[in-house]
Amino acid sequence: MKVLQEPTCVSDYISLSTCEWKMGGPTNCSAELRLVYQLVFLISETNMCVPENNGAAGCVCHLFMEDMVGADNYTLDLWAGQQLLWKGSFKPSEHVKPKAPENLTVYTNVSETLLLTWSNPYPPDNYLYEKLTYAVNIWNENDPTDSRIYDVTYQEPTLRIAASTLKSGVSYRARVRAWAQSYNSTWSEWSPSTKWYNAYKEPFEKH
């Protein structure tokens, strides 16, 4: 039994890190493998993660890590029974993938403006709370080519767009994701999408 692609890990920088890897052949990850992780510190307990299958030869493990700070560094050991398959380390602050934004809502009754709001997925005392910026994807439900991305480069979790910039009488969907530039993070997953009907009426031209 051998590792084909070494584990790569990302952290939500609050309580959870996720590691994925590929084995050299079909593997029952939960029955055959264990990922042992330990904070590099004077006194810290050893933790063990039971991986799940991610495809026939892929494994994924969810590592619970409390009260993460920038200096945290973990040792990682991948075991198959008594055989050590791989040894590495992981620093959560250098591999951040934020949690997805929540509670995306579209308000259509604000004059001729669409107001989109969502929730920052972090509590105010978390390091990422004031570091997130966002991207909003809006698309026509009946025409996949009618899709656009709005970059929200300010911290407020809102976006205002003129209803007239979208087609009238069409159902649209929106979703939002987050990233933390100062942590050199990857993008979060997209939030669940929300749907609305763009009932904006074109003004009549006067002749």
Positions of PLM-derived features:
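Pro/Thr/Ser/Gly-rich low-complexity, intrinsically disordered linker/stalk tracts
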Residues: 1-25, 84-128, 168, 186-207
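N-terminal "mature ectodomain cap" immediately after the signal peptide
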Residues: 1-78, 89
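Short coil/turn linkers that define WD40 beta-propeller blade boundaries
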Residues: 43, 84, 143-144
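Short beta-strand segments within Ig-like beta-sandwich modules, predominantly Fibronectin type-III
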Residues: 48-57, 148-158
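Beta-strand-rich modules
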Residues: 56-91, 160-186
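Accessory, usually C-terminal, subdomains that scaffold auxiliary metal cofactors
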Residues: 150-159, 177, 185-195
